[in-house]
Amino acid sequence: MDPPHNRWAFHHVADLMKTAPISNHGGSVSPLPRRPIHLDDISFTALDGSTTNWNRHLRETYCDAICVIHDGHIVDERYFNGLDEGSLHLLMSVTKSMTAAALGVAIGRGLLSINDLVTTIAPEFAGTSLDGCTVRQLIDMTAGTDFVEDYGLYLNPDSDSVLIEYERQAGYRPLGNSPAIGVLKHFTTYANARPHGTIFDYRSPLTNIVARILEIVNGIPFNDVLSRDIWSTFGMEHRANILVDPLGFPAAEGGMSCSVRDLARFGLAYLNDGVINGQAVLPESWVQDTREGDDDARNCYASYVQNFAGASFEGDNWSMYHNAFWVMERNQQFSGLGIFGQYCWIHRPSRTVIARFSTYPSATPYDLSAETVRGFNAVVQTLVSRPR
């Protein structure tokens, strides 16, 4: 994950690590008609006050691939650093958004409720930090589990921090001298920091428990859940994969790789209230809840910003984290986000989806993240101002 090596590694994950396949099982592919619009020369003001354009912006913000969809058509699609339309790229935490979509499908089928207790479905976590925790608190990261996700620790990859050890157990880093216990067993060693449902605190391992719950209620491995409930029904074009830990459990919080077109298709389902090609692939109520959220999620997020994030936090004016999406403006724009610059950005007023892969030189650089979203907004302004 360390630059500059991540520029190659992020689209060669299966060559470096053990993965499990995700497939649409030979089903039909959802069409993405093309209506190219020349965006190269659109100009906008960069974060430093200078004038830039779309083409320069993409190169200066370490873009690997991007697919812009407007009114259901691809209007711009580009690849850099050896990628092409069939290349897979690591999604990082946009994987969480995929996991949440599979959760929405399972809830829609009546396999569980969002307010079910985790330990009722998965008694293997009884006696851990998840006692009394609901599925809602897991997916919204308001569970009380004690885990510090400090990406500054990446500067010391040989440390014995819980984050680095977690990444060894997940398969992101070599195990070294650590015993192979896997991410689920590793999770059971975490203590509880606070009552559930009181504050948002971003901790990736929580999403793995959601995946385990989905395995239990569906009776199949998590990568097969994704194949059946996301890849097949959404009409994905390219085979995907997901990193697995030493015991074979998928890293549902960040280990998935797919093509940028398929990530755009995923965003289209959320833009279109859960419908792809006239077929409902996600419950409309789940999509609506994702983009609108609720006061509990907003209040938990506000407490996080006030108490932990500080004034420089890039999301200090955002609404909330809900159903594994970052809601930037309630009911208007929301995004799946992954470290090092992965985006599935949905802008409802303009009917736009932007799927983007990047390899930022650090995990969460405020300037590059803010610059990227600034570029998205410049594209939207151009698209909506064009005559129809």
Model-derived regions: residue spans:
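Active-site SXXK
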Residues: G72, L90-N115, L138, V210-L214, ...
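Active-site helix/loop module of the DD-peptidase/beta-lactamase fold
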Residues: L90, G108-Y151, T189, P205, ...
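N-terminal leader/targeting segments and the immediately adjacent pre-domain N-terminus
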Residues: M1-D84, L111-L112, I139-D140, G144-D146, ...
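Short, charged, amphipathic alpha-helices and their helix-cap/turn boundaries
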Residues: H73-R78, T119-T120, L155-H196, I220-R239
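Active-site Gly/Thr loop motif
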Residues: E237-N241, R291-V353
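Structured C-terminal helix/loop/strand segments within mature extracytoplasmic catalytic/sensor domains
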Residues: Q333-R388
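Short, small/polar residue-rich loop motifs at catalytic or cofactor-binding pockets
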Residues: E60-C63, S87, V94, I339-F340
